[in-house]
Design a protein with these regions (language model features):
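NAD(P)-binding Rossmann-fold cofactor-contacting core
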Residues: 19-35
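Glycine-rich adenosine-cofactor-binding loop
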Residues: 1-16
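Glycine-rich hexapeptide-repeat left-handed beta-helix
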Residues: 133, 139-204
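Phosphate-bearing ligand-interacting subdomains
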Residues: 31-88
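Short amphipathic alpha-helical segments
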Residues: 13-15, 69-73, 185
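Short active-site oxyanion
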Residues: 1, 23-24, 53-58
């Protein structure tokens, strides 16, 4: 089951159309958009009761902050990763519960994707790289090999991270940026320069 009926929910539903999985429906605190093509079975508060038959869940929130809020509200749910059939994930890569891997994405050998993180369409996570929980990579992000992206980091479309660097928790990297060195505190990277941000979890 998918919690959330925004754009992220529609994207995840597309990944669940294959013959090996069944999309039971959606839970949403709000009315779904007009023309929503999938069944809405209740609100997020109904999830614990619906989980008793072994259903898996994934949170489809359109921001990192909202995604984490749902998981914290319902930590007991059986969260499952969703990998789009058109993605390629190496046999020894690790994808933790609640993560989503989009169409055309590549996760290299020995890489790991943290719980409730999102790897957007066409993004590449290189060999032995680690994406920690609650990160979001938009489409066509290129992560080199042996890179560590710490929790609550947001990376915009088509950004590139050089091999063997570490990005601090809560960092925001804007669309199209190229990052070639470590970032040791929470920052925004924009137009080739780091801009200081206060410590604490990142938001988008």
């Amino acid at each position: 089951m998918v919690i959330g009926t925004g754009l992220a929910g529609r994207v995840i539903a597309d990944a669940l159309r294959g013959p090996e999985v069944t999309l039971a429906g959606f839970l949403s605190a709000d009315l779904p958009p007009d023309g929503w093509p999938y069944p809405v079975l209740g609100a997020p508060e109904d999830a614990p009761g619906l989980s008793r038959d072994g259903r898996g869940f994934i949170v489809a929130a359109d921001s990192l902050k909202d995604r984490e809020a749902v998981v914290r509200a319902f930590p007991e749910l059986g969260y499952q990763a969703v990998i789009h059939p058109a993605a390629h994930v190496a046999a020894d890569a690790v994808v933790e519960p609640g993560a989503y891997i989009g169409a055309g994405a590549v996760v290299g050998t020995g890489a790991s994707i943290g719980a409730h993180s999102v790897i957007g369409e066409g993004s590449i996570v290189g060999a032995l790289s680690r994406i920690e929980p609650y990160c979001e990579l938009l489409a066509r992000v290129n992560i080199g090999h042996e890179v560590t992206v710490k929790d609550h980091t947001f990376i915009g479309h088509s950004a590139t991270l050089k091999d063997k660097i570490t990005i601090a928790a809560g960092t925001v990297i804007q669309t199209g940026e190229i990052v070639v060195k470590d970032m040791v505190m929470k920052m925004v990277y924009k137009r080739g320069a780091w801009i200081y941000k206060e410590n604490g979890p990142g938001e988008r």
